[in-house]
Amino acid sequence: RDKHVTGVQTCALPIYPRTVYPGLADADLDVPAEKLISLMESTRVDKAIVVPLGPEDHYLGEIIEQYPGRFAGVGCYDGSAPDQAKNLDDRINKSNIQGIRIGEVDASADTPDDPRQFSMFPLLEAMSERNLRVWFYAESRQVQLLEKVLDVLPQLVVVFNHCGFMVSLDNLTVDQHYRPHFTTEVPPPTLELLGRLAERPNTYIHFSGQYAFSHDPYPYPDMLPVADFIYNTFGPNRMLWASDFPWIAEQPGYAQQLALVDHLLPNLTQAERQQITGGTAASLFDF
């Protein structure tokens, strides 16, 4: 049996407090872990990394405990926490998170030159000390600032989301299938910057989110140059497939999302395919 480990997945129940995104993740969104498990079993996917919609980890901690060996958790940045290091320790103890998703490095109107003065540096430093993974999804200016942080914190592990596209949430829309969509060039003009970050051995990248950027119908052939670039710069050992469940559950479908590995990277060896669909994630997370 093949062993696949999925990347970003989201589970949510209305009874738990969480962040609401109108039209995309309304308050009544009901995505129990059991729905994800059913799809995983039908596609021979064994394990999943789950990321909630906001900094509330209640359900995440519950399903990690309820299904031992099945899930690993990545939390979301909690901007309301007065002490980021303490917040991390509390969430590690309560919910066993192994990373934090963030979307910026400095929120200042006038960004300082010293990366140690960036608004998110205390969090990033605390994450590096605790060997937590940075789940990163941000626009290009913030990626450039992250590059400076990595000069100071070279051991910090960063996982770029969704094929390394660098987009602003200000540009986020919802498509006809109730999925996130960004209007952007394909290939994006930020590949050179992404390639610079790929030179650092502690950077990784999701093979995911193609539907949100592509101008073509499934299997998104305009994403072929992006897939090729990622393969050539990061390599299979730093690539991890992600489904982006639940947004893809209906269109294109969970199995179809997994099949994009073969559609967009048709020349992989079996060992490379297994690395992208499981080995890399297993090297980064404990299940």
Q: What positions do the PLM features span?
A:
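Hydrophobic faces of well-ordered beta-strands that scaffold small-molecule active sites
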Residues: R1, K47-V50, A72-G75, Q98-I102, ...
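Single conserved hydrophobic/aromatic residue that forms the stacking wall/gate
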Residues: D2-C11
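Divalent metal-dependent hydrolysis catalytic cores, especially in the metallo-beta-lactamase
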Residues: P17-P55, R70-C76, Q98-V105, V134
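Short, acidic/polar
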Residues: L29-L39, A81-I92, T190
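Conserved, mostly hydrophobic/aromatic
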Residues: M40, L60, R91, I100, ...
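Active-site gating/metal-coordination segments in enzymes
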Residues: P55-R141, E147-K148, H181-E185, Q210
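Catalytic pocket-lining loop regions of alpha/beta-barrel enzymes
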Residues: D113-L240
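His/Asp/Glu-enriched, well-ordered alpha-helical/loop segment
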Residues: F245-F287
